[in-house]
Regions:
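Long extracytoplasmic/lumenal interhelical loops at the membrane interface
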Residues: 339-405, 424-428
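N-terminal hydrophobic segments of proteins, predominantly signal-anchor/transmembrane helices
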Residues: 49-150, 444-446
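Alpha-helical transmembrane segments of multi-pass inner-membrane proteins
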Residues: 124-132, 172-200, 211-216, 220-270, ...
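Hydrophobic transmembrane alpha-helices and their immediate junctions
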Residues: 279, 283, 403-445
Length: 507
């Protein structure tokens, strides 16, 4: 409760100012000192303090930090090392989630366990047990793997407890604005130049996935990878679309302009998977808004993808950007790469067949190794800490679950896939407002990427949004059960003895 004469909004603004000053100050100190250790030493106690005093504020801030994590790592000199991450700033996000989880456990107000919550709990238990799997190449690989597989899912439980309607909308607006900022920075990288700190990172990491040939390098904006950038733009595009249906929003011309910038950045980033998932999510959200049946919603989503392929074929057939700007321009190379992959997703120049094959191999490996290879076998922990494991992650969740958790992982994941999509659809139908569409849209935009902890800014966000949606739905169901009117039962029938007068029932 706010003190007398001081509104909650003013306290929230003051808290934001304190966090901003402390973060910028520690960033400048680390810049001068040439090490990330100082930044982490200053920031982590601040994160813990905010988590205990105002968890909702920290949840609202989390998207900002996760989006700018890659930028901070590149802009400031590195230095230092820690056992689990190699860069101390990487543990700030996991620390925030762990402390928020402790706050969640120590406070009341979480709704009763739903069917989805029970499945997620089973997933968490399996992830912890798989830490001890010897096939991943050591205990350190398993513990490190928890940072990518287990810790992001803590946001589900945090969302169930603290994901109120107000908090969820604040997070949504932050994600929308951040996607616009990231899109503008990514377009600057793509069509103007890469700043010196980004060029240094490209050269030092030798990131071959960024190179499209003809001297064209993919943009990655403020993120740690081009894939993370693309997935976040996809989520941002869905959020902007849902916010357009909200009563309180930006003026429509500005709103549409923001959506256009994000969509252009997503297109020119040239990641086909995110384009397909964006079309799928938009189709599903549109059908859910019309309150169609589940099968019709699925058909709408698939139809949106088909329309995308047909439209891309029409543009590509006409020469696309090459006709306007020349075949060697940056825009033409990016557009032709994108359009060729969309119109012929299984062609020789597409990476989709390879991803599907790797996913299929990963799923079938669950039958050869029923207990999997461990929590750290499909993420960065394997390359950093594993001593014997040679397994690698696939592009999609089913393959990763088959490799990491074996047959149990596959069963739990497909149960989770069913329960999560069902919850998102039911929330959208029951609430009849943009908030339900938001949860369903984010689920679809990140489909088959839910356990990819390498997507720092996206993975935890998906789990928080899903947890918040599940919590809202569970509370609504509980309120309905409490408010159902009691039905009076008719008196039990008894036989009348011979000669006994009739009894008049009193109502």
């Amino acid at each position: 409760m706010a003190p007398q004469g001081q509104s909650s909004s003013s306290r929230g603004g003051r808290s934001w100012l304190i966090v901003l000053v402390a973060t910028v100050g520690s960033l400048l100190i680390s810049l001068v000192a040439g090490t990330h250790v100082i930044f982490a030493v200053i920031t982590i106690p601040l994160v813990i303090s905010i988590a205990w005093s105002s968890p909702e504020l920290l949840i609202t801030i989390m998207p900002v930090w996760m989006v700018f994590l890659g930028f901070v790592r590149r802009f400031t000199p590195g230095g230092g090392n820690v056992t689990f991450s190699g860069d101390p700033v990487l543990i700030i996000g996991p620390v925030a989630l762990i402390v928020l989880m402790l706050v969640t456990v120590n406070t009341r107000g979480a709704p009763p366990l739903s069917k989805l919550a029970r499945v997620v709990l089973g997933f968490n238990i399996v992830a912890i047990l798989e830490v001890a799997n010897p096939k991943q190449g050591g205990l350190m690989a398993g513990v490190g793997g928890l940072l990518f597989v287990f810790v992001p899912t803590l946001a589900f439980w945090i969302g169930r407890r603290f994901g109120s309607v107000d908090v969820l909308w604040r997070v949504a607006w932050n994600v929308a604005i951040l996607s616009l900022v990231a899109a503008l920075y990514g377009l600057y990288q793509q069509f103007v130049q890469f700043p010196s700190w980004d060029l240094t990172w490209i050269e030092s990491k030798g990131y071959t996935a960024l190179n499209l040939g003809s001297g064209i390098v993919r943009a990655f904006s403020t993120f740690s990878s081009a894939q993370e950038y693309a997935v976040f733009l996809s989520v941002g595009l869905i959020v902007w679309s849902v916010l357009a249906a909200k009563s309180v929003r930006m003026p429509l011309p500005l709103h549409l302009a923001a959506m256009t910038v994000v969509a252009l950045a997503l297109f020119y980033e040239s990641q086909r998977t995110s384009i397909f998932l964006s079309a799928l999510a938009l189709g599903v959200v549109m059908a859910a808004r019309l309150r169609m049946r589940p099968i019709t919603v699925a058909i709408f989503g698939v139809s949106a993808v088909v329309v995308l392929v047909v439209f891309a074929g029409a543009i590509g057939g006409g020469g696309g950007s090459a006709a306007l700007q020349g075949p060697d321009s940056t825009a033409a190379v990016l557009a032709n790469h994108q359009l060729s992959g969309i119109t012929d997703p299984t062609g020789s120049g597409s990476s989709l067949p390879g991803h599907i094959k790797a996913t299929r191999v990963g799923m079938f490996s669950a039958f050869k190794n029923p207990f999997g290879h461990g929590s750290g076998s499909t993420n960065l922990a394997a390359s950093r800490y594993s001593t014997t494991s040679k397994t690698a992650g696939t592009e999609f969740d089913p393959g990763n679950m088959g490799i990491a958790f074996g047959i149990f992982g596959l069963i739990i994941y497909f149960l989770m896939l069913w329960r999560m999509t069902a919850m998102g659809y039911r929330l959208a139908i029951v609430r009849r407002d943009p908030l339900g569409l938001l949860v369903l849209g984010v689920i679809m935009a990140t489909l088959l990427q839910w356990t990819n902890g390498n997507l720092y800014s996206v993975c935890w966000l998906l789990w928080f949004v899903v947890g918040a949606g599940d919590g809202l739905l569970s509370r609504q169901d509980a309120e309905v059960d409490l408010t159902l009117p009691s039905v009076e039962t008719a008196p039990a029938f008894t036989w009348r003895k011979p000669g006994e007068p009739r009894r008049v029932a009193r109502i």
